[in-house]
Amino acid sequence: MSDSSTSKAKVLIVEDDDDLRHGLTRRLQNSGYEVVQATDGVAAISVARHERPDVVLLDLGLPAGSGLIVLERYANLPDLSTIPVVVLTGRDPRIAEPATRKFHVAAFLQKPADNKDLVEAIERALRTQTAHGRRPLTPPSEPT
């Protein structure tokens, strides 16, 4: 992503369920975001390093490294530690939250999240990111 104030925010979706991942991708693209994808914990690290997303939408239940392992790796890698994460879980977020408390988690969403909650969580994460000194972003414009 460039540093231009007109740049779209880039979201990395880390979700192993193909249908859900593709549905989330369409919804976010329709809301004006640039989207990249990963299907497991290993890819979540390599894609984040290569693509430099502005926010990560992370499923906690992943093959090849659970979401908690991904959070721990992000926290310990200087080039990834400032990326805000929105956790997406099939469990009650109140149960997932204590396990992730020590990591930088901007928001929790329970599957299936409606589009309004999804976009609000991502925008909140982007505001958090800007407040913590990463490059300023312009939230995507409303779809026409």
Locations of regions flagged by a protein language model:
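Active-site beta3 strand of CheY-like receiver
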Residues: E51-L57, L62
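Acidic catalytic/metal-coordinating carboxylates
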Residues: D40-A43, S66-E72
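The feature encodes the CheY-like receiver
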Residues: P63, S81, P93
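C-terminal output helix
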Residues: A113-E123, T130, R134
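Conserved acidic carboxylate
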Residues: E15
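Alpha4 helix (beta4-alpha4-beta5 surface) of REC/receiver domains from two-component response regulators
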Residues: H22, S66-I69, D92-L109, K116, ...
